[in-house]
């Protein structure tokens, strides 16, 4: 893949996020219920934000939105041909359900290991394991639901850039 094509994909991913951020759906979510720990809380109308990993996310359940104290749950979209920034979740596990698409995840020290997942797969990522998901489709977004045992979803995300790994 040429650098120009790679740059165009990254720009396209940023444009998708930028346009989504301008849409009415990007408004603050409607919270139904009290975050006091005694009510069932519904989070509705959640807009798109950009994660530290440079992907559009739709925050759902977290400490901030629902008063969760031990987990977060969100929807992640990987635009066609795009990748997340390589990263780790310091001290926290992740569980992913891939709703749509095919995704290659490079992982481990130096991102030297790889797994390809498809719609319907459940994926477990142990705490502190570096990983970088890439949407294998050039035309369709990959969509996943992600759960973490971290109510502050983005707070413990640390970008990963080892000297010996090329994060293309």
Predicted segments — roles?
Residues 1-12:
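Bacterial N-terminal signal peptides that target proteins for export
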Residues 83, 92-118:
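A short beta-strand-loop-beta hairpin characteristic of the jelly-roll/cupin
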Residues 11-21:
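Bacterial N-terminal signal peptides
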Residues 85-86, 105-106, 114, 125, ...:
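Short beta-strand His + acidic residue motifs that chelate non-heme Fe in jelly-roll/DSBH
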Residues 118-119, 127-154:
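Ligand-binding loop in jelly-roll beta-barrel domains
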Residues 25-70, 85, 158-168:
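A short, N-terminal "cap"/entry segment at the start of jelly-roll beta-barrel domains
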Residues 68-73, 139:
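Extracytoplasmic
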Residues 74-89:
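Conserved short histidine dyad/triad with adjacent acidic residue
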């Amino acid at each position: 893949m040429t650098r120009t094509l790679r740059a165009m994909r990254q720009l396209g991913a940023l444009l998708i996020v930028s346009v989504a951020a301008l849409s009415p759906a990007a408004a603050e979510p409607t919270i139904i219920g009290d975050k006091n720990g005694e009510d069932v809380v519904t989070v509705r109308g959640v807009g798109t934000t950009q994660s530290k990993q440079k992907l559009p996310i739709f925050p759902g359940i977290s400490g901030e939105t629902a008063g969760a104290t031990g987990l977060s749950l969100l929807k992640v979209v990987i635009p066609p041909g795009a990748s997340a920034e390589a990263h780790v979740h310091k001290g926290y596990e992740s569980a992913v359900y891939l709703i749509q698409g095919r995704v290659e995840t490079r992982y481990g020290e130096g991102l030297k290991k790889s797994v390809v997942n498809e719609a319907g797969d459940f994926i477990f990522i142990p705490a502190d394991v570096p990983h970088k998901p890439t949407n294998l489709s050039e035309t369709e977004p990959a969509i996943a639901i992600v759960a973490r045992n971290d109510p502050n979803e983005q707070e413990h995300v640390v970008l990963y850039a080892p000297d010996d790994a090329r994060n293309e």
